[in-house]
A protein has these predicted regions:
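Structured soluble/peripheral alpha/beta segments that form catalytic or ligand/cofactor-binding pockets
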Residues: 1-318
Length: 318
């Protein structure tokens, strides 16, 4: 129990890694995200599973890339689930999720004709909640509230893709969200989150809202100390060949302790979920980015959202 409490983020408790009571919004949502990259195999893994109980729908997106080339892809947004869905929200379609220890260990199992796996995630850092950065939607009234936390950890297990057995041992991430409410006000965001190693992690979430609000969430974890971001500058280069895809991001961040880092990122395999989810009307793309900080490589989330092509940012500053 003491180990579990060591990993609980600010503003949450042990029960928040379990399922949550369904809220009143028509598109109230609970979702689970798991991602890693194996540099030795150049293997990229990303899976997102969620439920909309009030709409009777579940969704699952799962991609496996090698060197940026898709080897397996599933994007299904219309699983039928009951409106009173309980713990079975962790197990529909081919994916089964199981919380072994809250905020410490999760198990992922998958059973489909081409892809099977059995993986465990073990946390190596305390989870980070957007409540810690005082994001307004975390404390909004019922019907507007939306909660989020994310966590760095270690993946182990096996995967079988088209008959090829693959041993997995890789640094990666997971995150959780529940509620919808204020997220409907999103008007674009850019997320960069990279564990270069257990001793160096950079987490940046730059968000714009339709009512004009902007907010920066994130942290630098370095030498066993984590501090919230104080400022960030993100310079984005868009691909000339792929109009909605980022080619490169140059980043400079400073945290509350005065530590500054300059890093760059480029996306590897890109997952385009734009206009697939029934509750969203933005261009939303996920990827694993290859990051560089002073010659050291790292691999982590690189996600971006925009509503119209004219709103694609070139520079974001906080």
């Amino acid at each position: 129990m003491s180990e579990e409490r060591d990993f609980v983020p600010v503003g949450l408790d042990l029960t928040d890694d379990d399922i949550h009571a369904i809220g009143p919004e028509p598109w109230w949502r609970e979702a689970w995200y798991f991602e890693f990259f194996d540099p030795a195999r150049r293997l990229q893994f990303q899976v997102y599973q969620g439920v909309f109980p009030n709409a009777g729908r579940g969704d699952l997106t799962l991609y496996v890339f090698t060197d940026g080339r898709p080897g397996y892809e599933l994007m299904k947004m219309d699983y039928a689930i009951p409106s009173d869905v309980g713990r079975e929200r962790l197990c529909f379609g081919p994916l089964k999720l199981e919380m072994l220890e809250p905020f410490v260990r999760w198990r992922l199992q998958y059973d489909s004709p081409r892809l099977q796996f059995d993986l465990t995630f073990r946390a190596i850092h305390r989870a980070f909640s957007w409540a810690e950065a005082k994001l307004w939607m975390e404390e909004a009234p019922v019907g507007e509230q939306s909660r989020h936390f994310d966590q760095v950890g270690w993946y182990e297990g096996w995967m079988n893709l088209d008959g090829e057995e693959i041993d997995i041992a890789a640094l990666g991430m997971r995150d959780r969200m529940w509620g919808w409410g204020a997220r409907a006000l999103w008007r674009g965001y850019l997320v960069l989150w990279v564990p270069f190693s257990p001793s160096l992690v950079v987490n940046v979430a730059a968000m714009n809202f339709a009512d004009g609000r902007r907010q920066l969430c994130g942290y630098i974890h370095q030498d066993r100390e984590r501090a919230l971001l104080r400022s960030a500058r993100l310079a984005i280069t868009w691909s000339e060949r792929r109009w909605k895809s980022i080619e490169r991001v140059e980043v400079r961040v400073t945290d509350a302790r005065g530590r500054s880092l300059a890093l760059s990122a480029r996306p590897l395999g890109i997952i385009d979920t734009s206009h697939h989810w029934p509750h969203r009307f933005d261009h939303l793309l996920f990827s694993i980015g290859e990051y560089d900080v002073q010659g050291t490589k790292g691999y982590g989330c690189l996600t971006w959202s925009f509503v119209t092509a004219d709103e694609r940012p070139s520079v974001i500053e906080f």
